[in-house]
Structures are given as C-alpha cells and as structure tokens.
C-alpha cells in the first residue's frame, strides 16, 4: 500500500472536467485508490465521490493506493496533479 499527499494547484480545483480526467486515469488501474481531505474519504474511481470532496486550489489530498499496479497508478496520479490536469497552460 502506498500513501502520498498531493496538492490541488490548478486554478479551478477539482471541478467536473478535472474530476473526469482523474477518474478516467485511475480506472485504468486495478489497484484500489482512495482520496481523503476535510474528513471525507472517497473512491478515486467514482466521479460523484471525487466531486463531493469539493477540493479547491490549495487543498491537500491524501492518496492511498493498494494493489498490484500501485506504483504505476501513483505515478500517473502524481503526474496528473503536477501537470494541473493539463488546464493551466
């Protein structure tokens, strides 16, 4: 199991388009992935769950990934956050 903290840095936070990219990315992996912040924990493969986090710019999200492809999944998710969901260019 891997745990890591990622910060939402894109201007609009985890809005619908960014959430869809996150869910699509994580759905490619078999590992179970949860995101938590502000006392809420959700499945990273659920659009509604991720939207419920209401994560705005600057929000720190704890990521927990468990499974065979956890390292690859964490790398993909980290890159998505680092690239600001390819929005703030």
From Swiss-Prot:
Source organism superkingdom: Bacteria
Protein name: Phosphocarrier protein HPr
Regulation: Phosphorylation on Ser-46 inhibits the phosphoryl transfer from enzyme I to HPr.
Keyword Protein transport recorded: no
Protein family: Belongs to the HPr family.
Classification of source organism: Bacteria, Pseudomonadati, Pseudomonadota, Gammaproteobacteria, Lysobacterales
Keywords: Cytoplasm, Phosphoprotein, Phosphotransferase system, Sugar transport, Transport
Record GO cellular component, one term: cytoplasm
